[in-house]
Design a protein with these regions (language model features):
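Ser/Thr-centric signal marking residues that sit
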Residues: 114, 166, 195, 207
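Conserved, mostly hydrophobic/aromatic
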Residues: 167, 200
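Histidine/acidic residue-rich metal-binding segments in metalloenzymes
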Residues: 2-4, 9-164, 180
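Short glycine/serine- and small hydrophobic-enriched flexible loop segments
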Residues: 77, 201-205
Length: 213
């Protein structure tokens, strides 16, 4: 079961989320939740568009690290009251990971998933001069800073992060180009099913940082 705290057409409010978690609890189910603060993201997007800032570089600027961390903290307080375990899906920031560690210190059962692109790519991909090249990396949460990558690798090594999944979205390059001129119209997501295993195997064996370090 997956829930979203962002995307207006898909997001779930606190009351509905709490009730859904209580229902899952009856049957031993567990939910995975996409954590970003939708309201502030929408306000930042509106400000960027009003200023004519519509390039892919605006994408990470409208979804900064604190908005993921705030949503994770918010969710974890709800699950604390609900008394249920939870999965944080595609976690991408050091700040969000800190909120997970705080919840675990309170005795909560929290699982964490990240993705290969958060381990291997950083936000420089959005600042390429070639619009199409930058657009292909639009996803949410966006790629983060190198320091976030380092924290994620260490967390994967010590078991703080349990799962690496793909969040696979198989948009073509032509579909990505459909949003030319407005980053909010670029379909969000990256493919990853075919490459996850190879990427992780290669990086764990031959590159640094890795869990072996």
């Amino acid at each position: 079961f997956k829930m979203y705290m962002t995307y207006p057409a898909m997001m779930i409010g606190d009351q509905d989320m709490f009730c859904a978690l209580q229902e899952l609890k009856k049957y031993g189910g567990i939910a995975g939740v996409h954590c970003e603060n939708a309201g502030v993201i929408d306000a930042l997007i509106a400000a960027h568009k009003a200023a004519g800032q519509t390039a892919p570089s605006s994408h990470p600027e409208c979804r900064p690290n604190p908005l993921e961390a705030e949503a994770v903290a918010h969710l974890l307080r709800i699950t604390e009251v609900a008394g249920v375990p939870i999965v944080i899906v595609h976690l991408s920031t050091k700040e969000a990971l800190l909120e997970v560690m705080r919840a675990r210190a309170r005795g909560q059962q929290v699982y964490v998933e990240t993705c290969p692109h958060y381990l291997l790519l950083d936000d420089s991909v959005y600042y390429q001069e070639d619009y199409s090249a930058a657009a292909r990396f639009i996803c949410a949460p966006p790629m983060r800073k190198k320091e976030d990558q380092e924290v994620l690798w260490k967390a994967l090594a010590n078991g703080t992060i349990q799962t690496v999944s793909t969040d696979h979205c198989s948009f073509t390059l032509q579909q990505k180009d459909a949003g030319r001129g407005d980053f909010t119209k670029i379909p969000g997501g990256l493919p990853g099913v075919e490459t996850r295993g190879e990427l992780l195997y290669t990086c764990l064996l031959y590159t640094s940082p890795s869990p072996r370090d």
